[in-house]
């Protein structure tokens, strides 16, 4: 196998010629899997084979041609393709067959099937491929004596630096004005952590992700970030470097904001918003200075406050300085009001705000340059507002609506909170957006205190500035319109923070939501969320992955927001927060969840490429082998089918074998199926790989992956009644498989009856009494007798009653289990008395019949008429027992098609059934579940 493994490596290399990026991943397998033989080979080869997919349709001649071609091309090491390993040869040989069977499968799905199949191959069959691979490798090495196996491992190391360089450019680009110094510093600071943490990829995601990444890295390197940002007071760099929570911690810890501008540089825009909202009018002129360095959102809040002050003084048409003075006045007024409220709630907050005022004043003094910028902004805004305050307001309101659509979602929680706080405000349409932006960050960053401050500030705003909402929106618009004109941090922040905000409001939504709840923890996650949110937009597969990954953050944010809302009630309108904030995660999760619901379903059932890779376990293999996880497209089609057929049909058609194999044993089950084919392939095998390939190509269609998936299931069942029984109980446990459940009903219910009727009826000797079953049923369970009589006609009724029995079509496969009269008696007795034995050796009573049953499976629908008697009790008992299982299981199935949920439900149901009625164990579900896979695989072998 070493040779084959080496061949794998070579083949991976040879096949990876055009796909360098994958090969670096592929190399991990040979390096990590150090020749663990079959299983490691399978997975390694799967990955490598994915690279090879294009090559693998070449055919037997293609292999040798590849050798020649690779030899020609391989003279340069990097261009040389690794010689195909045994598995790759196998895949190349059989991929077309899998394709024929599963036209909708993507290469990955086909490779998974091939890998499962390969795992099931007999060593003899594999030996042919390994020999061929050795020959291939020898020829390859002769052709390329200097060939090295891992030339590409160094490449990934190189890639991070170029990625970091663009990031420097990205940082420097927005920071052209005042950030040129901090941005390179920042880039360096982030580069260091990126190299350490491998954050290079998100750099390409855009400024927002970079911001969050910077925040995350700032957590690791806050000192460096603070040092870098403070020189220029351009605070966005530090904002980016420090997570909003960390910045918040800094601010709260160092409430003496004498360095407020620098500290606020560190403070995230959200915290700054919190400050603004808490000090809404108060921070007025003082905060503009702080805001200069603050994120664009904070600047927007600043502008909103300025607009408030200007609005207050609009009649006077105050100038920028006047607006600052007005802001200071407003600060004092608002602060007095807030101090009253703050004293009620938290004197410490009053102190903080007082410190904020002091720091704001100090900042006004310290950061006159920033003020100049702000004055420019204010002048611009003032000019705009002075020109046409009403018209501009309207325009800005419209713009706000446009621009705030994102903010709506991103800040829906805070916006709703604000709305609930400000229902009386005039420009409701605009408020949510402007206010959302201003206060949402606060709600998310300081979540508790900030939200309290927010609400207080909202209250203050209600009292002081009812006109502010319009201007918040208005200012926000003006800030957008002035982004270019307003060069101070908005430009840097706008490009990094703000421009992306438009693009990445959704990312920010999630980031903020997450940051609100989990703070620093989520701070690490938010970048992922941003990336993921973008990925969601990019593709459903990514969205499915992102949904999985991003949903936890969403839920976290939800729980966090709930916690926050729960905490906010302390002295504030926590109620608006609670519903609104809860509403925010819904909106976020809602946005994600539309896709997520579809993607989630797909993910759970099939999984996107990434999810599949992560799911590469036995379960996934079994699912793929059974055709369950063929591909996203197949999943979509399956979803459509399931929607048409109904969940039960979906489960039945798609899940029959999968469900039981899944619950029984993902890996062994799938391999079982594949082994069936491989055996036949072994029969086909010829001395030469070419002949083997040809024969296997010819023979594979016979054992096509479908057969491999579906027929193999019957074969294991044939070999093992127990396996079938266990699989069927699993199916029944999943409830949607009505036909399966009927069959399971037959066996399980017969067993079930055995146990139940032992208590219920003298049918403890039901083995003999099965012939008299109807009599007993009539006497004991007239309804069952009715079912038995009517079952031919009543099967639909049973389907109704046995909700899972919707599908008869799956029955052919599942009907295998019900045995005829004496066979059933024997099977039940053996299963009841010898659960393990049935799995091991006594499968013959059940298993031998089952061997005949694969054929009978198709006929099972007919035997059902005869078996209806048994089925009657079975159906009745199954109705009793399986309705139990189906009621729990069906909801799980209907609610989520996630394989994990179904597996858990099935497992739990099997356990419960085993507890409820060992008859289920007759099938050996619980006991055989583990054994069945092993036995099945052995039987197949």
Swiss-Prot record:
Record has Manganese as a keyword: no
Task: Name the major location.
Answer: nucleus
Binding region for DNA: 80-148
- On this chain, the residues bearing Phosphoserine are 243, 478, 485, 704, 822, 844
A Pfam family of this chain: DUF2028
Keywords linked to the UniProt accession: Coiled coil, DNA-binding, Isopeptide bond, Nucleus, Phosphoprotein, Transcription, Transcription regulation, Ubl conjugation
Compositional bias ranges of the Low complexity kind: 661-670
Which residue intervals are annotated with compositional bias (Basic and acidic residues) in the record? 1-18, 177-191, 499-508, 536-552, 758-771, 866-882
Question: One GO CC annotation, please?
Answer: nucleus
Q: Name one GO molecular function term.
A: sequence-specific double-stranded DNA binding
Basic residues compositional bias: what residue ranges?
449-459, 743-757, 823-834
Q: Where found?
A: Nucleus
Q: Which residues form a coiled coil?
A: 326-370
- Ranges of Acidic residues composition bias in the record: 39-52, 63-75
The record's section on SUPFAM superfamilies has: HMG-box (SSF47095)
Cross-link for Glycyl lysine isopeptide (Lys-Gly) (interchain with G-Cter in SUMO2), residue positions? 385, 573, 696
Q: Where is this region: Disordered?
A: 1-21, 39-80, 157-200, 221-242, 438-482, 499-600, 635-677, 714-771, 803-888, 912-941
- The residue ranges flagged as biased composition, category Polar residues, are 723-742, 805-817
Q: Which PANTHER family match?
A: HMG BOX TRANSCRIPTION FACTOR BBX, HMG-BOX TRANSCRIPTION FACTOR BBX
Free-text function comment from the UniProt entry: Transcription factor that is necessary for cell cycle progression from G1 to S phase.
What is the official name of this protein in its record? HMG box transcription factor BBX
Specify the species: Homo sapiens
